Amino acid sequence: MGSGPIDPKELLKGLDSFLTRDGEVKSVDGIAKIFSLMKEARKMVSRCTYLNIILQTRAPEVLVKFIDVGGYKLLNSWLTYSKTTNNIPLLQQILLTLQHLPLTVDHLKQNNTAKLVKQLSKSSEDEELRKLASVLVSDWMAVIRSQSSTQPAEKDKKKRKEEGKSRTTLPERPLTEVKAETRAEEAPEKKKEKPKSLRTTAPSHAKFRSTGLELDTPSLVPVKKNSSTVVVSDKYNLKPIPLKRQSATAAPGDAAPPAEKKYKPLNTTPNTTKEIKVKIIPPQPMEGLGFLDALNSAPVPGIKIKKKKKVLSPTAAKPSPFEGKTSTEPSTAKPSSPEPAAPAEPMDTDRPGTPVPAVEVPELMDAASSEPGALDAKPVESPGDPNQLTRKGRKRKTVTWPEEGKLREYFYFELDETERVNVNKIKDFGEAAKREILSDRHAFETARRLSHDNMEEKVPWVCPRPLVLPSPLVIPGSNSQERYIQAEREKGILQELFLNKESPHEPDPEPYEPIPPKLIPLDEECAMDETPYVETLEPGGSGGSPDGAGGSKLPPVLANLMGSMGAGKSPQGPGGGGINVQEILTSIMGSPNNHPSEELLKQPDYSDKLKQMLVPHGLLGPGPVANGFPPGGPGGPKGMQHFPPGPGGPMPGPHGGPGGPVGPRLLGPPPPSRGGDPFWDGPGDPMRGGPMRGGPGPGPGPYHRGRGGRGGNEPPPPPPFRGARGGRSGGGPPNGRGGPGGGGMVGGGGHRPHEGPGGSMGSGHRSHEGPGGSMGSGHRSHEGPGHGGPHGHRPHDVPSHRGHDHRGPPPHEHRGHDGHGGGGHRGHDGGHSHGGDMSNRPVCRHFMMKGNCRYENNCAFYHPGVNGPPLP
């Protein structure tokens, strides 16, 4: 129908001429027209409308006409489609229509409608649909039973007529036709079964029936014989030809037709006894089951086939005694023909032999059933009457020769078993070993032959004669426009160049000497004499970065060392001069190729050399106090990084408390007393209980060595190098602790120091300090009475906090809480600074030999000058 929505009322109006008032189809012609419209219906509305029209029709002739024109097949297609799409309403409508149609068994056999309905009755999800399908199946079963009960009587009459005809007409038919017919029937049976298996099963089957059923009811044999054969034929749809043979063999008194007796000559006595046993044995056991009926009755034609196959195998192997020279005659699979003068075909089968003599053997009429006596027929014997039969009802075999002109000579060649074998396939290990020996011998001979080959020309080279070719009739590409097209194309496209090599050899290797990478110092020498960059910051702003950004490209040890040496050149303190980075490295590392690090450490003058080398350049401690100010102060060396005065910003002088004078805030406090080790605090260290500006303090407090390379009067690197981890900033002492009354470090190692006014910061950990208090290396300071600023404020003892790692870009600054007097805490981004004194641990040999260690600050051993004081 159309693609748009369908109105059933409009459809019924169009069909009004074919329908009555009740919706029933008027005539037979109308149902044909409606069926043609039903075939075109694609929408569910139109299909349901047509199904309801069929349901309203009551006239049987109209319904029969609907089935005949193809309505039943159409309903089958609709049923299949609706079952696939699981359309329950359409399925119910189709089942009602099928129930309404007068279907017969022949109709049900036409397609799989019955099977689909039975599946719906069992496996449908809808309960109403299952009930409807089961009702329809039961109705159809009743139709099948009623029709099958009326058919057996008619079948019996037909079979009796056919049996009578076969008995009367069989002797009159030519013998060759009978043989051809029996052969055509049994040809598929030959292909399916092998003669040996048939030969073994036949006697066992006969024995089963003879032993089990003979003792029960032998007197019922003549009564049940005919009835059983008829019932079995009805059940199993046996063909009439096996039934003819059954009936022919069933009557022992009748004269057997020649087709039946042709199987008996070679094995007469046992076969006849078996057949007699089969006839005597009742076909049904005492239970009377249908399966045993089939066992007893169905194999009767099968036994005939088995007998024939038994005969086939001995005759195929029998030699034909003609002339004593010809080979066997195995033409058993070829159907026989009545003409005696067709000699070429039976000899085409596979058989070994020599050239066949000129005398040609005619085809045997039936090689499968030939008797030994018939094979002994003499060549002189004339072909007698074709209708003449032997005493057993068989035509006598005769041998004739064709005329001289029709004689042919055939040559047969024996088939070699290894002719079609893959010779390259190895069969066993012996052959593989033999082949291996042959290949080794061949390789040896080839090598010996080629060893004396001087590769000289054996045949002199002769230039071949030049070929003289006629001039071409057509110049190739003379009229082609493609070259112009390509020329236009290449004006805007690069030409494709394929460069040929000068020679097929590999190119010469390019001379290349591996050169060790050049070490570029972190602080260049040319920039050291210039004044460091002064950055103007707000009071709460961040100070200079303790280390340059380039330090991350080198190991931290080398970066710190180089930064320290580079910074030491800038102020040019007393006794300071230019220093070479490589000299310091080689002096620290010694000669690792000649002496191991342990031997270097054991030398007595090793530490003295190190001190002499590092002290003049300000690497081991800060310079002396200039004019009472720390380095970088008003009287100190130039180039110290200054901070602008902030509100309440502490002064490094004696008044570092909240009431101190406003002045430039310097990062570097005055150095500690140099009474002890220049790298470690002596007895006068304010953090170890030494006297501060506020008075003496009690016993020593914990000390913690800060990371970094700078200290003393060395200024930090310029701000472009901010953001790296490590290095102390400001002028604090090398151990990272604040001096008396001053600030030690601000933000070393990238942590936020929480400072009060005048507070100082240790090695990169947070310290909460009171006014005038100084903080050690990130640990809680144990202070006695009298500590603090001039106003007597006791510092706030706060446990040390590990700093947080602010990982941001280097310019990122954190402004923190202001303490007493507004001093802010400042910090720089960078890595964690662990610190800690490792001098009591073994020296890291990798650090001593190579100058760096891959574990860096996480190493559990002592790195001199990094996680502890340098070696003395």
Swiss-Prot record:
Which body tissues produce this protein?
Expressed in testis, brain and intestine (at protein level). Highly expressed in testis.
Q: What is its main location?
A: nucleus
Q: Where is this region: Necessary for interaction with PPP1CA?
A: 357-433
Q: Which GO terms describe its molecular function?
A: DNA binding; enzyme-substrate adaptor activity; protein phosphatase 1 binding; protein phosphatase inhibitor activity; RNA binding; zinc ion binding
* Comp. bias regions, Polar residues: 583-595
Q: Where in or outside the cell?
A: Nucleus; Chromosome
Mutation effect (residue 396 to A): Does not abolish interaction with PPP1CA and does not reduce PPP1CA inhibition
User: Could you name the Gene Ontology cellular component terms for this entry?
Assistant: chromatin; chromosome, telomeric region; nuclear body; PTW/PP1 phosphatase complex
GO biological process terms, semicolon-separated: negative regulation of cardiac muscle cell apoptotic process; negative regulation of mitotic DNA damage checkpoint; negative regulation of transcription elongation by RNA polymerase II; positive regulation of telomere maintenance; positive regulation of termination of RNA polymerase II transcription, poly(A)-coupled; positive regulation of transcription elongation by RNA polymerase II; protein stabilization; RNA polymerase II promoter clearance
Q: Which superkingdom, per the lineage?
A: Eukaryota
Q: Where is this region: Necessary for interaction with PPP1CC?
A: 393-408
List where Gly residues composition bias occurs: 540-551, 724-762
The protein's name in its UniProt record: Serine/threonine-protein phosphatase 1 regulatory subunit 10
